[in-house]
């Protein structure tokens, strides 16, 4: 197995993520009224390219090393592939934490599977963080089995467009490959998003258009 260099950051990672096929979908999405963000991201598409996934893992491994992490823990489900890549890049044991409220086997299966996390410093890995509700719940699940979450590593940090951020997610050291607004900027710069649509989208997000704002009609809806 070829050793992975985790010593130097890859400055092109944000662009590679933003331009991953299918990650940014042209058009707007208003899943529940005026909820932002307006551009849905299919972040699992960043995992399709093995070279990109390996480099994402290297960035996470650098962060894990800085924090003195004992175990890398992937958040079910979208954080698991990225956490595995971080584990492989850094040579750090891997585990994953079940999604709180998982139905079907909650009485038969432990909340954390894989490496033992009791008494360990762990890095929580997920695809994104926005309001931080998921981070709080996963952190509580890990604390319940004796683990200490010392940091969070995500593909995309979306806290800048969240209406509010949970105190737990705000306080934990967090590193991301890119941010939501940077993804949109890079997607527009590389021809994935129409520049006019992009400008309207950013305005909608930053200025929080109301539900009855007529400019919504100017934004094509995502399929």
Language-model segment annotations:
Residues 1-68:
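Active-site-facing substrate-recognition patch
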Residues 2-17, 140, 145-223:
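PRPP-dependent phosphoribosyltransferase catalytic core
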Residues 71, 121-123, 151:
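Structural motif
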Residues 83-126, 131-137:
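Short, glycine/charge-rich flexible loops or terminal/linker lids adjacent to PRPP-binding catalytic cores
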